[in-house]
């Protein structure tokens, strides 16, 4: 017997409502500077937990009798009447109406789903399409600039090669100058060999002139 009672107490403690919430409810009802013993607060917490469990069970039976698996607010209100708490039913109904009104106002303040989707789509289009076009333009400009730079490099290479060929020709001419061969002949046209410099100057003639 004691074991069963201890088990029930343990299960009730596991399902107990938060102590802070119950304490706020107690302070909101009792006069100021009222004191609550620890055992009294514990009893209130257990009572609140039992009441919620009892009300849930009664509401579930009403939903089942109406062939529904979903528990509706009206089921809870009807359950309060069945467990003989009609005054709670009236108060709870007012709170539910205020809650539904607040939800309705909140929905009206929220933007339309289609408008949100359109704005998101516009942002995606602006984010994805524009950068792609700009990227294509930038790539085209870079390609043109590279072509121009490549042409300039090739032209410079050709100019350097031409200049090197000219320099090579000049260097070759400087290293091996062309010497015109002159044949010395006498008055009759016979070649003169081993003649002195003075004699050579007097009888110097080009073969072409003969």
Curated annotation (Swiss-Prot):
Amino acid composition bias (Basic and acidic residues), ranges on this chain: 121-130
Compartment list: Nucleus
Main location: nucleus
One Pfam match: CBFD_NFYB_HMF
Biased composition (Acidic residues): 131-140, 155-168
The protein, known as: DNA polymerase epsilon subunit D
Subunit structure and binding partners: DNA polymerase epsilon is a heterotetramer consisting of cdc20/Pol2, dpb2, dpb3, and dpb4. Heterodimer consisting dpb3 and dpb4. Interacts with the replication factor dpb3, cdc20, PCNA and rfc5; the replication licensing factors mcm3 and mcm4; the FACT complex subunits spt16 and pob3; the CHD1-type remodeler hrp3; the SWI/SNF chromatin remodeling complex subunits snf22, arp9, arp42, ssr1, ssr3, and ssr4; the histones H4 and H2B; the histone chaperones Nap1 and h; and the histone deacetylases sir2 and clr6. Interacts with dri1.
Name of the encoding gene: dpb4
């Amino acid at each position: 017997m004691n074991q069963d009672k201890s088990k029930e107490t343990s299960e009730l403690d596991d399902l107990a409502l938060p102590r802070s919430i119950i304490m706020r409810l107690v302070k909101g009802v009792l006069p100021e500077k009222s004191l609550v013993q620890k055992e009294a607060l514990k009893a209130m917490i257990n009572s609140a937990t039992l009441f919620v469990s009892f009300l849930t069970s009664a509401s579930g039976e009403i939903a089942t009798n109406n062939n529904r698996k979903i528990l509706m607010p009206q089921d809870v209100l009807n359950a309060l009447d069945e467990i003989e708490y009609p005054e709670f039913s009236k108060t709870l109904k007012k709170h539910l109406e205020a809650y539904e009104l607040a939800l309705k106002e909140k929905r009206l303040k929220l933007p339309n789903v289609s408008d949100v989707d359109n704005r998101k789509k516009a942002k995606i289009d602006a984010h994805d399409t524009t950068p792609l076009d700009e990227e294509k333009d930038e790539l085209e400009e870079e390609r043109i600039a590279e072509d121009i730079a490549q042409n300039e490099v090739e032209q410079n290479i050709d100019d350097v090669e031409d200049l090197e060929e000219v320099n090579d020709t000049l260097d070759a001419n400087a290293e091996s100058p062309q010497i015109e061969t002159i044949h010395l002949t006498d008055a009759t046209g016979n070649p003169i060999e081993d003649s002195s410099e003075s004699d050579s100057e007097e009888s110097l003639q080009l073969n072409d002139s003969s």
